[in-house]
Amino acid sequence: MPPANPHLNHTGGCTKTEEEEAASSEEDSGSFHGSGVCKWFNVRMGFGFLSMTHREGICLDSPVDVFVHQSKLHMEGFRSLKEGEAVEFTFKRSSKGLESLQVTGPGGAPCVGSEKKPKGTQKRRSKGDRCFNCGGPNHHAKECQLPPQPKKCHFCQSISHMVANCPIKAQQLSPGSQGKSTTSTGEEEDMSHTPLLPESTD
C-alpha cells in the first residue's frame, strides 16, 4: 500500500519535485553572460526586462527577454535603468524564464539609470533641495555661497516680522472669517432685543 501512493498521485508531488530538482540543478550548474539593452523598466515597481542581443559573446538571431530586478543593478543611489541603456549582465535559467543575476554598464561600469523617479521620491527630494538660507534650489543652507541671511516672513518675505505677526496675512484672513461672524452676531443681538421691546410695551 505505501508504494502505491506515489504512483496514484503521479501528477501531484512526485512530478513537481522532479521538475523542481531539474530546475534547481540547472540553476546550480552556472550562470551565463549576456549583453544588450534595457527593453523597459518600471521605476515605481523596481523591475523590468532586458533585451539580450549577445549570449556568451555570440550575436543572437533575435533578441531574448531577460527579467531584471532593481536589486541586481550595479550602481549607486536609486537603482533603475533607462529604456535603451546598454547593459552587460550575468543571468540564469529558472522555472519562470531567464533572470538576471548582476547587471552593469558596458565593461562592468555602473549602470546609468533612468531620470524618472517614483512620484513620492520626487516630492520628498524637491522639498529637501531648497536652501533655507537664500531660498535657492539644488543646495542646502550649509552649502550656501551667500552669508547668513536675516530671518523673514514666509508669507510676504518681509524681514521686519515673522509669519505669526504678518499684517498682510492677518488682513487676508480677517475680512472672510471675522467679518461674517461679527455681522451674524450683531444680527442675533438686534433680533433678540427687538421681540422683547414690543412685549414689555404691551
UniProtKB/Swiss-Prot annotation:
Residues 33-106 form the CSD domain. This is Protein lin-28 homolog A. The CCHC zinc fingers interact with the GGAG motif at the 3' end of let-7 miRNAs precursors, more generally they bind the 5'-NGNNG-3' consensus motif with micromolar affinity. The CSD domain recognizes the loop at the 5' end. The flexible linker allows accommodating variable sequences and lengths among let-7 family members. Residues 1-33, 100-128, 170-202 are annotated as: Disordered. Zn(2+) 1 binds at C131, C134, H139, C144. Monomer. It comes from Danio rerio. Its main location: cytoplasm. Residues 171-185 have a biased composition (Polar residues). GO terms for cellular component: cytoplasm; cytoplasmic stress granule; nucleolus; nucleus; P-body; rough endoplasmic reticulum. Residues 18-29 have a biased composition (Acidic residues). Zn(2+) 2 binds at C153, C156, H161, C166. Keywords: Cytoplasm, Endoplasmic reticulum, Metal-binding, Nucleus, Phosphoprotein, Repeat, RNA-binding, RNA-mediated gene silencing, Zinc, Zinc-finger. Signal peptide: none annotated. Residues 107-130 are annotated as: Flexible linker. InterPro entries: CSD, CSP_DNA-bd, Lin-28_RNA-binding, Lin-28A-like_Znf-CCHC_2, NA-bd_OB-fold, Znf_CCHC, Znf_CCHC_sf. The modification Phosphoserine is found at S174. A zinc finger (CCHC-type) spans 129-146, 151-168.
